Amino acid sequence: MSSPIQELVKDIKNLQPVPAVINQILEIIDSPDSSMEQIAQIIQYDPAITASVLRTCNSVYFGLKTPAESIKDAITMLGMEQLIEIVLMKSGAKALSGKQEGYGLQEGAMWKYSVSSALIAKQIAVKLSLENKNTIFTAALLKDIGKTVLDRFVQDSFEKISALVVDRNYSFREAEKKIIGVDHAELGGMIAKIWKFSPRMVNIIRHHHLADVSMIKNKEIAAVYLADCICM
């Protein structure tokens, strides 16, 4: 009989990978030589993301007088920063939109929470004059990706986890770790590594709950942690 950890590894391997456009964009915007043309070129070769971005750009919300017909139009009308936010959010939507019944989350609930957390984390990063604010935004957006894999194990062990939370004052994350052998933040870090995210991204996702208090000195992790607390 396989252990929960072995089952988790199998589930991670079967998890649909995040669109490659996320890594490609983050690599470019972290470079001081990045340009609008490079960003547009990456996005326009992903038809699904392009269609989604143009649909969002041309929605009533933005109220543009002239419809955007290309990614370059969208960049000109919305600006690079806002376009990048839209692309990253649309790219991560599929992975985070399902039900997470073990966590009491209905369809779409985690996605809405993740977007709110990402937007707040970026605002904090700007206030603190942190570099790599788009990396912080993306890490905050995807920080709970581990829950998508851990969910069925949480459902199976919910009574045991709840008992630790109620009777022994464990946090839910601590109870996950105790019963299953790994918590969703650690698992999220594993997934981020498999998806070939940068070491910085992996580190932020893995430590976003600041279980290791020494990580409080890392302002990028602290920004995501604070955003998480604000959104709870």
Question: Where do the language-model regions lie?
Answer:
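Conserved alpha-helical "signature site"
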Residues: 1-166, 170-232
